């Protein structure tokens, strides 16, 4: 009896001890807040308040308590994929507090699987795809705009899923291997495993999107997990803020390759960064960096395609192009050095497509299409209301510049209107319009009234600025709050009042003193912003430390606040202020001085397919900084949208700082292979270096790749008349496109074709665009794709054209868009299915080849 009583008492004691232990170690709201502050980057800790993070944590735990799946989410997934507020490099906002109840009402009675699908439908109801610059808007700003690029769409969806307690993460390929672009989508944790979906692109099931096949061709697929994550995925790297993992083996075939870095004597180089590069946008772009161990080795798991591995030390560098799966071990020899003029040519072959699509019944597809149509109608009604409000504002102003500004505001029109009214009340309308004209289009869509007022009221007037400065410099380099890709904040009053009046005058008259102040007072550490999230100027001033990029933004912001014209040079990234001329700022040198300048004269002998090469599309230039080659940015439009200058618009010769460079050019083939040509060259002070831009061409001539029955009929969507390609075209070649209502791949295709409108109108290639239904055609027309060539024939396919193409050309199902070039003899000489960048140029290249064969 005593033994039994002893055992009972002991058991009870152990039970209560375990309960207390569990309570002590439970992941509480307090622990979650500490977790956020332990791993968040410096900018997030100084630019946002503790109250803000408390609110976000509160809603995460509220969702865990109220959502039916809350108790089933493991602590690891909840901690790393629900609690974190940040998804990418977006501005943070109060999305959770604002939309929790609305989203809860949509999903509280659903299974976890169906809830993920429903949240994506909710996102699509508010947002559709459209390209923009590289700065990522906050989720609520994206909703206000009603559209965003893939990075903004996926940031919105991840935020929305986390808001209702569903673990979610953004997955991205830094660069595609088979075409010039990148992409981001979302993975959600459902019942023990991760599933993917296209953000704001609802499908009837998970693991389905237009990018199934492109994803299978990726070399790298990464996600950055907040904190020190110990999940089952392969870890690429760990930092003070995040764990970078790869998920590429979930989408296609992969292999692990080991790399050894040695010097010219064969000695292994320990603790050395190795950059892994993908050819994309006419450059070898670094997509991941790893560090060698004590044996000079590191490794990478990647898709079965070609990449470049690069390393440098003490001014010497080495590189090796490799194809994953061909060799288990690759050696990089540091046997190149600055000043050596060499030429290299590589064929960069992407992985082959290998995708498996989940089953979707006709009923599921029909219901999903019905939902999409309804969501489109809601979003289009919102857009129409915005347009009406914009037109009303335009009608009430006679200022043509202001009219153009209002047209760009989308859902932010009221903020801009309120600002203009505020400025008019202070007799400052001209200055206000100048300010609005010198921020980006995206700024017009998401800037706050507080920011605009601060910069209007606290920016020195032109008369208070440097007199020798050209008048146009005032608006762009003093008045404008936009410096780089930072979050705009109301910093002017704080920065302009920071120094006493006498000190402000000293800095204004002698900007080198301001350079010295920043050197001496702002501690620089690039580990403070490993995710490349700029710290705001106010945050830098508060913390007195920053990464180099945030320091540069801070200097320019402070200089402008003191009436000094300043910028980060958009081409080479140099920080500069304007005295009698633009002067480079060097925070690492005793004195700032401009680099000696030489010139580059690029010669090009036109070929039929490319008469005027385009930067980022056909060629790029990089400068050696002693360790890496840094891309020069020759943008035709706003920076960050990857739209480069035509070679014909470059200065001839083009001024460049003295130094060592590489000119890379490439030709993208139909199968995604890139034929590259790279030249190392030097620029010497006062001298002109002449180079010839080489675009390699394939040796093969025009080839028949399949057949298509040109007698297949389609129906005119407007008249109901039935016709076929043979009747319309007779004995010529033609372009046939099978399109959908306007998905992201179709949108890209239309934009690529519109970019070459005049070329297509002058060509001998008629275009026929067909759709699977009149409803799809009507939705496509609602998209208002501007700039398409005249004379396009539209049709409705009853399935015969689709079935013929899929079967005869061995395509992967009805994955649109599908483009072919064929003739009325049923010969197909070009085929492209799904997501493609540069389609317009590829079609015209085939048109040139057709013309040459007929001569």
Regions found by a protein language model. Give the residues of each.
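Hydrophobic/aromatic-rich core segments of domains that either
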Residues: 21-22, 105-110, 115-121, 130-140, ...
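Thiol-/selenol-based redox modules, centered on thioredoxin-like
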Residues: 816, 820-855
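Secondary-structure boundary elements
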Residues: 23-145, 181, 271, 364-368, ...
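Short, ordered, surface-exposed loop/turn motifs in non-cytosolic proteins
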Residues: 264-283, 305-306, 510, 607-637
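Short Pro-Gly-centered beta-turn/loop motif in secreted/extracellular proteins
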Residues: 191, 297-309, 313-316, 322-326, ...
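Short, acidic Ser/Thr/Gly-rich low-complexity loop/linker segments typical of extracellular
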Residues: 280-301, 626-650
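Short active-site neighborhood of thiol/selenol oxidoreductases, capturing the structured segment around
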Residues: 725-753, 766-769
């Amino acid at each position: 009896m005593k033994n039994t009583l002893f055992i009972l008492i002991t058991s009870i004691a152990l039970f209560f001890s375990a309960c207390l232990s569990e309570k002590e170690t439970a992941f509480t709201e307090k622990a979650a807040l500490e977790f956020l502050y332990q791993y968040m980057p410096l900018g997030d800790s100084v630019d946002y308040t503790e109250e803000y993070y408390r609110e976000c944590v509160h809603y995460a735990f509220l969702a865990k308590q109220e959502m039916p799946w809350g108790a089933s989410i493991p602590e690891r997934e909840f901690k790393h994929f629900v609690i974190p507020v940040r998804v990418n490099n977006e501005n943070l906002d109060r999305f959770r507090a604002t939309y929790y109840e609305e989203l809860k009402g949509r999903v509280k009675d659903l299974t976890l699987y169906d809830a993920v699908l429903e949240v994506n439908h909710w996102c699509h109801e508010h947002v559709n795809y459209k390209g923009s610059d590289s700065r990522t808007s906050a989720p609520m700003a994206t909703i206000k705009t009603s559209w965003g690029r893939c990075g903004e769409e996926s940031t919105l969806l991840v935020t929305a899923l986390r808001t209702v307690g569903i673990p979610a993460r953004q997955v991205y390929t830094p660069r595609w291997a088979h075409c010039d672009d990148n992409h981001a989508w979302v993975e959600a944790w459902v019942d023990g495993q991760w599933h993917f979906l296209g953000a704001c692109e609802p499908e009837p099931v998970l693991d389905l999107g237009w990018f199934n096949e492109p994803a299978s061709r990726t070399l790298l697929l990464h996600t950055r997990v907040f904190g020190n994550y110990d999940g089952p995925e392969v870890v690429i790297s760990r930092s003070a803020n995040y764990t970078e993992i790869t998920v590429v083996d979930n989408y296609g075939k992969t292999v692990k390759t080991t790399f050894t870095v040695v010097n010219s004597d064969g000695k292994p180089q320990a603790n050395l960064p190795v950059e892994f590069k993908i050819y994309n946008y006419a450059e070898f772009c670094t997509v991941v960096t790893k560090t060698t161990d004590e044996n000079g080795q590191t490794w990478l798991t990647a898709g079965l395609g070609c990449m470049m591995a690069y390393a440098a030390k003490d001014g010497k560098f080495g590189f090796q192009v490799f194809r994953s799966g061909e060799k288990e071990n690759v050696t990089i020899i540091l046997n190149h050095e600055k000043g050596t003029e060499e030429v290299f040519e590589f064929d960069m072959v992407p992985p082959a497509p290998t995708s498996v699509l989940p089953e979707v019944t006709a009923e599921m597809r029909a219901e999903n299409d019905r939902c999409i149509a309804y969501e489109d109608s809601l979003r289009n009604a919102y857009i129409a209301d915005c347009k009406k409000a914009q037109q009303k504002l335009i009608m009430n102003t006679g200022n043509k510049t202001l009219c153009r500004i209002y047209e760009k505001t989308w859902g932010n029109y009221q903020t801009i209107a309120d600002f203009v009214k505020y400025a008019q009340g202070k007799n400052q309308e001209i200055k206000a319009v100048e300010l609005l004209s010198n921020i980006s289009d995206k700024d017009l869509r998401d800037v706050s009234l507080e920011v605009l007022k601060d910069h209007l009221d606290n920016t020195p007037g032109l008369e208070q600025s440097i007199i020798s400065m050209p008048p146009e410099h005032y608006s762009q380099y003093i008045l404008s709050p936009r410096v780089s890709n930072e979050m705009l904040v109301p910093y002017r009053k704080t920065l302009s009042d920071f120094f006493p009046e006498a000190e402000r005058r000293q800095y204004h008259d002698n900007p080198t003193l301001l350079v010295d102040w920043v050197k001496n007072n702002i501690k620089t550490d690039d580990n403070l912003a490993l995710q490349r999230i700029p710290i705001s100027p106010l945050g830098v001033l508060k913390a007195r430390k920053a990464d180099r990029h945030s320091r540069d933004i801070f200097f320019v912001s402070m200089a402008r606040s003191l009436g000094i014209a300043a910028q980060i040079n958009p081409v080479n990234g140099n920080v500069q202020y304007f005295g009698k001329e633009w002067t480079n700022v060097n925070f690492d040198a005793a004195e700032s001085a401009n680099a000696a300048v030489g010139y580059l004269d690029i010669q090009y002998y036109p070929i039929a397919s490319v008469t005027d090469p385009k930067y980022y599309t056909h060629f790029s230039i990089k400068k050696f900084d002693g360790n890496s080659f840094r891309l020069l940015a020759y943008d035709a439009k706003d920076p960050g949208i990857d739209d480069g200058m035509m070679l014909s618009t470059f200065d001839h010769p083009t001024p460049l700082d003295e130094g060592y460079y590489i000119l890379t050019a490439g030709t993208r083939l139909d199968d995604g292979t890139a034929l590259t040509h790279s030249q190392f060259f030097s620029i010497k002070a006062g001298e002109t270096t002449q180079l010839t831009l080489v675009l390699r061409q394939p040796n093969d001539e025009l080839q028949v790749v399949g057949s298509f029955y040109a007698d297949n009929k389609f129906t005119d969507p407007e008249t109901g008349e039935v016709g076929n390609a043979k009747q319309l075209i007779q004995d010529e070649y033609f372009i046939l496109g099978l399109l959908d209502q306007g998905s992201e791949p179709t949108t890209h295709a239309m934009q690529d074709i519109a970019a070459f409108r005049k070329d297509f109108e002058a060509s001998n290639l008629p275009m026929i665009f067909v759709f699977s239904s009149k409803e799809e055609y009507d939705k496509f027309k609602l998209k208002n794709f501007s700039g398409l060539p005249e004379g396009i024939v539209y049709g409705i396919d009853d399935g015969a054209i689709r079935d013929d193409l899929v079967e005869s050309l061995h395509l992967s199902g009805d994955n649109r868009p599908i483009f072919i070039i064929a003739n009325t003899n049923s010969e197909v000489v070009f085929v492209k299915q799904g997501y493609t960048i540069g389609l317009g140029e590829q079609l015209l290249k085939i048109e040139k080849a057709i013309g040459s064969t007929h001569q």
